[in-house]
A protein has these predicted regions:
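C-terminal trimerization/auto-chaperone modules of long, extracellular attachment fibers and adhesins
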Residues: 487-490
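Short strand-turn-strand beta-turns centered on an Asx-Gly dipeptide
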Residues: 345, 423, 484, 500-501
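Residue-level detector of functionally pivotal "anchor" positions at catalytic/ligand-binding pockets or at interdomain
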Residues: 457-484
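A sequence-level/structural motif corresponding to short, flexible coil/turn segments enriched
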Residues: 18-464
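C-terminal tail/sorting-segment detector
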Residues: 2-3, 496-507
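Bacterial Sec-dependent N-terminal signal peptides
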Residues: 1-22, 468
Length: 507
């Protein structure tokens, strides 16, 4: 039998980088205070950038002093060249949770608030909204602005108890906004009932636990996508995912995300136990010994749905998240994190507490084309985990902005970036850009970092490569395995693969 030597080198690093265009910062919080790490940003089709954040100081912006020393939130606009346009103060105990723009460059902003709040613009009549909970941001609002900052519309929503037997606090927040065509699609995450309008109420599900001497009702996560006209009228409930009636008490929705293409709404979610999407049931099995499946639910709403099961295990999936999804060219691309095994490929096992994954799914059949993971060992599993801060679905590849987070202080001492080609090849970038928020359009990408200052950096969105990323040689009828013993067809981790006859050596 003829023997041969095959050497395959899979890239350890990608030298692809973004070219910086400009950088600036906003001072909005007093020394010793920290800006909200979860404040989102948006970019319109012309490259105008909208940055949000918390504030405890007046903001000097575009030649004006905006706001006072009271706590609040702000929206600041730059043009594509980094020139300050205007800033808006939102008064009250407010956290901005979602933001986007539409084809006409109108701006949509959502946030959570406690007590009373005032939503205002550069122009337009300010709107006062209220929430009975004074100390907890349990209510939410959504506002529409023109590109010039005129306040056009505001709606607010409060969660109420679905049952008198529930003792836990209930809340509602808006996690994502997508403007598509003449409609605005809004993701509501809630644990209590939400009256959207007189003709539409989102009913929260809860789990009843029989303690023998009493029935305890436990709140659960619910997620709904609701479409509105652009002024937040005519709401229609498109998709709702929640635990089933009489669900096992271990049932749980872990993570939910959605995207819109034309009139089609796509949903991707992670969970376990007994779940229902609209009226369709998805049951992840229990073995009676404390172990359960956990997996993914995918749906082209109203057309087709799919359940993708994970292997059974007994651990909670607190690091199972879907950070972002995008539909393009007949594919649904999904990025997030997982612990133990990946729902989109059970042969992919996390190294450490969690890993980053990207998966490609056929947008019509909802079958998985491929899934890859970064296989990064972040350290002690009871101290560090990985979290995705942002995802860029670029022209040539997906870029994932990853952070290694310290569980003890919630700080991220290590930043890592990964590029994933649309063929499923993953590589770590040689120089990582730390980011707490990233937004982009066809030409530009903006990276925002929040500390006691909001630092904004604009880059050209085209990746520049200065060296060879990988060298690949192929041989017919040979199976190649990576350094963890998994087939290369499933995941291409960094390593040197040497095939000599029937033996495979991995360096």
């Amino acid at each position: 039998m003829r023997k041969f030597l095959l050497l395959i080198a899979v890239a350890l690093f990608s030298t692809a980088t973004y070219a910086q265009l400009w950088s600036t910062s906003i001072s909005a919080v007093a020394e010793g205070d920290k800006a909200s790490q979860n404040s989102p940003a948006a970019m319109d089709k012309d490259g105008n950038l909208y940055v949000t954040g918390t504030k405890t100081l007046p903001i000097e912006f575009a030649g004006n002093e905006v706001g006072g020393e009271d706590a609040g939130a702000y929206i600041a606009k730059y043009n594509a060249e980094g020139v300050e346009q205007y800033a808006i103060e939102l008064i009250g105990s407010i956290d901005i949770t979602a933001i986007t723009t539409d084809a006409e460059n109108n701006l949509y902003v959502a946030g959570s608030f406690a007590g009373g709040a005032m939503i205002q613009g550069v122009t337009g009549e300010p709107k006062t909204i209220s929430n009975e909970e004074l100390d907890s941001k349990t209510a939410t609002f959504i506002a529409k602005y023109s590109a010039e900052g005129e306040l056009l519309a505001v709606k607010s929503y409060v969660a109420t108890l679905p049952s008198l037997d529930i003792w836990d606090p209930v809340q509602v927040s808006i996690a994502k906004i997508v403007a598509e065509g003449s409609k605005v699609y809004v993701e509501f995450d809630y644990t209590g009932n939400v009256a959207v309008e007189e003709n539409l109420s989102l009913s929260a599900k809860y789990i009843s636990i029989d303690w023998g001497f009493m029935i305890y009702c436990m709140v659960t996560n619910n997620a709904s996508v609701v479409s509105f006209d652009s002024d937040f009228t005519n709401p229609t409930e498109i998709a709702t995912l929640a635990v089933a009636d009489n669900a096992d008490q271990c049932s749980k929705l872990f993570s939910f995300n959605f995207d819109v293409e034309g009139e089609n709404v796509y949903v991707a979610a992670l969970g376990r136990g007994n779940l229902v999407l609209n009226s369709e049931a998805f049951d992840f099995a229990f073995d009676g010994q404390g172990s359960t499946e956990k997996g993914a639910i995918l749906s082209k709403v109203g057309v087709k749905s799919a359940k993708i099961s994970n292997i059974s295990n007994g651990n909670d999936a607190e690091f199972n998240t879907i950070s972002d999804i995008e539909v393009r060219d007949g594919k649904l691309y999904i990025a997030g994190t997982f612990n133990e095994t990946c729902a989109f490929d059970n042969e992919i096992v996390a190294v450490g507490a969690s890993d980053v994954f990207v998966a490609s799914v056929d947008a019509n059949e909802l079958t998985v084309d491929w899934a890859v993971a970064n296989a990064n060992d972040e350290g002690e599993t009871n101290k560090y985990y990985e979290a995705v801060s942002a995802v860029v679905f670029g022209n040539e590849s997906v870029t994932v902005f990853d952070a290694v987070v310290d569980m003890n202080n919630n700080e991220a001492p290590v930043a890592k970036n990964y590029t994933v080609s649309y063929e499923g090849v993953i590589a770590e970038t040689e120089e990582a850009i730390a980011a707490t928020a990233v937004v982009y359009n066809a030409n530009n990408i903006a990276v925002i970092n929040y500390t006691n200052e909001t630092v904004v950096t604009m880059y050209d969105s085209a990746l520049t490569t200065t060296a060879i990323e990988s060298v690949v040689a192929e041989a017919e009828n040979n199976v190649i395995y990576d350094i963890t013993g998994r087939r290369v067809e499933k995941i291409t981790n960094a390593g040197i693969y040497i095939v000599n006859g029937n033996k495979v050596l991995v360096k």
